[in-house]
């Protein structure tokens, strides 16, 4: 026996002479790391032992408190080289950190009967116990939350405070909490995972070479499958502890066997080492090639994804159950919106459209409307009973198409208006001339009629008393003359609407002068209303036709008066300059307009005052004049509150 022990000492002396790694442990939680009968064991310890074998380093285990270990690992002169801690996913500690060892998470724990915690918002205003330095603490350092934080040294301390009602919630790592729950039956799990993390080996940032060796060994264990065996051993179903005594016996027997085999195996070490070096080089070359291929595939995938994400069009792939398999998330919400209609206002049903495309295997294209926007929808069949849906905004094309159609209608209307104006002008002139003659003749015949009536008291004109008949004739002449003048005014509006104005005839026009002239010419209509003017000094000037601008403002003032016909109105006219633009504004507190009327007020012959003699050409002519002046007419109106019209022109440059 003494000889055997001596042989073991001789064999193990080279091992003792090798470099060592001081591995700090603190946990009492199976199956990670815990002490039984003075011996530390667990997944982390056995994994570190295996890493030590691969790196030819002796592993020395030292147990301290968690806070002391965290403090030591931040100290480059500490006696602790490596510890195993949990780090939040996508958040590294300010330490040298290994690849993930094992996934875990943190949840909220409360007393039995308390409300469940569905998300972070449910913690607002609560007292929450957080373990100092733990991965929950690291996560919260970059994700501030609105709750009262209570720092504790251990999760178990947090559970004790919870029982004493000194905290409302404990956020704890799942392995530790699972061990503590049987000891605290009044505590329960109250949430799904709030934070995801992973166990890692960490060391001081100055020990990057050591961490590189640990990572290389860890990856070798994963590639060889030995890591999976360790995971199955320590994390298998129902396996939280191992029989330490039997393990010690097996390890002792194994040590004896290894010692005997080591003596024999040293003879072949040289040959094996050479073979391993060749094999390692081959594996390294293959690993480098695989990593390069993975990087290329990842770059291509990211490039393809970025191209799809950068498309202005919405692209979505769905199956026949309408499950969204992939999408670049551009405007995809429209497909499920109740405001997404066909342009003819028919209701759109995504499922019906998808099923039709899948059944016919033919592409589907439709023009759609969403609020004030227009879209083109395309649905194309692809493999595996799936379709790709394309959404492209076509608002601008729709507006251009409408503008083109309106321009065509207006061109036809202009030609028609010019012909009508010419044909109506001549007979209208004859009517006006004849009515003027009749009016003058009635004045001359009135004395003669009175003289004849005295001689013949029973004389009648058209069955009426001569005085009444003459009065009716005079009224009829006035009505005919007024109607003829109205016809003439409409004809002039039609001619003006049909004939474009020549811009070369424009001169410098003061907007203040336009307001003052329009006020004088509408004084009779505005005398029953309160007119207020706020004119800019100096007056903003534009290039244009003064008479046409007078006509525009006169028409707008008359419309404002008509809108305030049921009560004395307040009409405000102002001129000002903004962003190098000259602006003329007229505002009233009249009846206002609904949205349907507002959309049509510049259409030719559209009027809401047909019974009062409106022709529907006033605002059409105004709109045309403003466009000829390269201006813009903005109209805002609220039913029952009033209307504001702003005329915006380019400010003229004055010498």
Swiss-Prot record:
Signal peptide: 1-17
Residues where Phosphohistidine is found: 422
Gene Ontology molecular functions: ATP binding; phosphorelay sensor kinase activity
Catalytic activity, reaction form: ATP + protein L-histidine = ADP + protein N-phospho-L-histidine
SUPFAM superfamilies documented for this protein: ATPase domain of HSP90 chaperone/DNA topoisomerase II/histidine kinase (SSF55874), Homodimeric domain of signal transducing histidine kinase (SSF47384), Periplasmic binding protein-like II (SSF53850)
Coiled coil (UniProt feature): none
Membrane disposition: Single-pass membrane protein
Alphabetically ordered keywords of this record: ATP-binding, Cell membrane, Kinase, Membrane, Nucleotide-binding, Phosphoprotein, Signal, Transferase, Transmembrane, Transmembrane helix
Gene Ontology CC: one annotated term: plasma membrane
Lineage: superkingdom: Bacteria
Transmembrane segments annotated in the record for this chain: 252-272
Chief subcellular location: membrane
Localization, UniProt: Cell membrane
EC number assigned by the record: 2.7.13.3
Domain Histidine kinase: 419-653
Annotated InterPro entries: HATPase_C_sf, His_kinase_dom, HisK_dim/P_dom, HisK_dim/P_sf, Sig_transdc_His_kin-like_C, Solute-binding_3/MltF_N
PANTHER family membership: SENSOR HISTIDINE KINASE, TWO-COMPONENT SENSOR PPRA
Annotated protein name in UniProt: Putative sensor protein Sfri_3689
Species assigned in the record: Shewanella frigidimarina (strain NCIMB 400)
């Amino acid at each position: 026996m003494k000889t055997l022990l001596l042989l073991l000492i001789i064999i193990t002396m080279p091992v003792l002479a090798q470099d060592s790694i001081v591995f700090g442990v603190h946990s009492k939680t199976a199956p990670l790391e815990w002490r039984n009968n003075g011996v530390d064991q667990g997944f982390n310890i056995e994994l570190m032992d295996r890493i030590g074998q691969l790196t030819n380093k002796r592993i020395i285990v030292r147990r301290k408190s968690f806070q002391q270990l965290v403090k030591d690992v931040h100290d480059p002169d500490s006696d602790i080289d490596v510890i195993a801690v949990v780090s939040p996913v996508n958040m590294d500690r300010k330490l040298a950190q290994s690849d993930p060892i094992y996934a875990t998470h943190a949840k909220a724990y409360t007393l039995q009967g308390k409300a469940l915690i569905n998300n972070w918002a449910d913690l607002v205003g609560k007292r929450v116990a957080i373990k100092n330095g733990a991965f929950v603490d690291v996560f919260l350092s970059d994700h501030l939350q609105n709750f009262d934080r209570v720092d504790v040294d251990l999760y178990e301390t947090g559970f004790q405070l919870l029982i004493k009602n000194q905290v409302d919630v404990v956020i704890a790592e799942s392995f530790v909490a699972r061990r503590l729950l049987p000891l605290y039956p009044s505590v329960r799990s109250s949430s799904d995972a709030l934070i995801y993390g992973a166990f890692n080996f960490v060391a001081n940032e100055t020990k990057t070479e050591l961490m590189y060796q640990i990572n290389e060994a860890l990856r070798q264990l994963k590639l060889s499958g030995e890591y999976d065996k360790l995971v199955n051993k320590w994390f298998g179903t129902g396996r939280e502890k191992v029989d330490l005594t039997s393990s010690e016996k097996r390890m002792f027997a194994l040590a004896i066997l290894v010692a005997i085999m080591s003596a024999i195996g040293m003879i072949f070490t040289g040959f094996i080492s050479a073979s391993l070096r060749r094999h390692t080089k081959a594996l390294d070359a293959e690993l480098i090639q695989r990593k390069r291929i993975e990087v290329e595939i990842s770059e291509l995938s990211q490039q393809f994804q970025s191209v799809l994400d950068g498309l202005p069009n919405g692209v979505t792939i769905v199956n026949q159950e309408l499950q969204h398999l992939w999408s670049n998330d551009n405007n995809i919400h429209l497909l499920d919106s109740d405001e997404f209609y066909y342009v003819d206002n028919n209701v759109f049903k995504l499922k019906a459209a998808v099923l039709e495309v899948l059944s016919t295997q033919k592409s589907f294209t439709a023009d759609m409307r969403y609020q004030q926007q227009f879209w083109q929808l395309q649905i194309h069949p692809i493999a595996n009973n799936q379709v790709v849906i394309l959404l492209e905004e076509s608002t601008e094309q729709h507006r251009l198409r409408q503008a083109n159609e309106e321009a065509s209608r207006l061109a036809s209307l202009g030609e028609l208006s010019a012909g009508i104006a010419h044909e109506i002008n001549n007979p209208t002139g004859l009517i006006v001339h004849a009515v003027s003659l009749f009016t003058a003749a009635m004045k001359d015949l009135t004395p003669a009629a009175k003289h004849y009536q005295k001689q013949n008291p029973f004389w009648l004109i058209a069955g009426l008393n001569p005085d009444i008949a003459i009065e009716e004739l005079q009224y009829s002449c006035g009505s005919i003359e007024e109607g003829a003048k109205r016809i003439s005014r409409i004809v002039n509006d039609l001619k003006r609407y049909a004939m474009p104005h020549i811009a070369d005839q424009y001169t410098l026009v003061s907007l203040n002068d336009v307001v003052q002239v329009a006020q004088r010419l509408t004084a009779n209509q505005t005398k029953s209303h309160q007119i207020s003017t706020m004119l800019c000094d100096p007056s903003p000037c534009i290039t244009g036709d003064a008479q046409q601008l007078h006509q525009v403002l006169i028409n707008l003032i008359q419309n404002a008066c008509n809108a305030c016909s049921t009560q004395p109105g307040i009409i405000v006219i102002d001129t000002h300059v903004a962003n190098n633009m000259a602006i003329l504004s007229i505002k009233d507190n009249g009846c206002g307009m609904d949205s349907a009327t507002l959309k049509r007020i510049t259409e030719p012959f559209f009027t809401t005052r047909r019974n009062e003699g409106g022709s529907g050409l006033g605002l059409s002519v105004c709109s045309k004049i403003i466009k000829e002046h390269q201006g813009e007419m903005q109209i805002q109106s609220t039913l029952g509150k009033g209307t504001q019209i702003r005329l915006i022109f380019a400010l003229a440059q004055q010498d």
